[in-house]
């Protein structure tokens, strides 16, 4: 072990996220001066099986959302356990923190404390190695730029409007490279603003930078997007496909055992009726991917959805799998879904994140690297997407710097890779072959 790559200092602080809530930022410095800084994201619609984000609970300070406890855990406990360790041994460092926490869901130290350190260590190690983060994590073959899932209409828990589904996304699949994909997305985003204005609808944006208009139905949200695609000079389906994040756990009524779609004429639906409703949407519109179509605990409903649509579209488990290899293994075993959403703070360490992506790929499930609704300028997920050749990234709309930071970092990575960079477009959906 080289002394130069040993961890010399670990320092955490409380900073602000894109929603004006506190989050954890960690600085790690190695003996040779190599430095890494990472900020932790936070979700709005969280799966009940996610790793625990430690909040202070003091209502007199940030309404109880302070993260001083997590910061103190880094500065007083975690730092002592990893000082002097080699930053290049990510497995040992993450394992040490997980053991120090000692709980199944990281509730003692907080996933936000552990993850901040985990990512900052990797960044410092990359600097020490003289490599960009994507190359340090992914090695020689990291070169696939992801197809962006751009969330241009927000509903559900991400917006104060009457749309049931949380996200309506566009995927620029005909682009020759990421740079052009980003341009296509931006042009459709601006086109959509014009379309909404023309209908006299609100063009304020939600948490993830998408528009949050009041529309009469979920279908109308898709219709206005299709209009915007055409007005931007592109062909729906051929050039740009549609993605949905239904976030069904948010509109599932536990007592009634029904799904309540307030934007629909017949609001109450059983799992079977909801699957049929989705099937009709998929037949009618160029939908290629659907996330969290059913409640996270409705495994029988998920099985029906997978049997009905699993060969036609990508079915992504977010709240269902919570970036957890145990949950994912159950899903693979039961033939549920065909894709996993990867959110670093759902599981709480870089090692476990990479393990989930690896497990998904081995089972022919795709892995979609994702932001959270509460973000910062940290662009680690851009590097994770390229490092793992995941082929897909979900990081919001074409507004708000907290979202654009990830896209801009991908532009830089693509430029750095030069002729070695690849962009698979529609072929990224290897789970549908």
From Swiss-Prot:
GO terms for biological process: glycolytic process. One of its GO terms (molecular function) is magnesium ion binding. One of its GO terms (cellular component) is phosphopyruvate hydratase complex. Its cofactor is Mg(2+). Binds a second Mg(2+) ion via substrate during catalysis. SUPFAM superfamilies: Enolase C-terminal domain-like (SSF51604), Enolase N-terminal domain-like (SSF54826). Mg(2+) binds at residues 245, 291, 318. The keyword Acetylation does not apply. InterPro entries: Enolase, Enolase-like_C_sf, Enolase-like_N, Enolase_C, Enolase_CS, Enolase_N. Its EC number is 4.2.1.11. (2R)-2-phosphoglycerate binds at residues 166, 343, 372-373, 394. It is found in: Cytoplasm; Secreted; Cell surface. CDD domains: enolase. It comes from the Bacteria. Residues 47-59 have a biased composition (Basic and acidic residues). This is Enolase. It catalyses: (2R)-2-phosphoglycerate = phosphoenolpyruvate + H2O. Residues 37-59 are annotated as: Disordered. Keywords: Cytoplasm, Glycolysis, Lyase, Magnesium, Metal-binding, Secreted. PROSITE patterns: ENOLASE. Belongs to the enolase family.
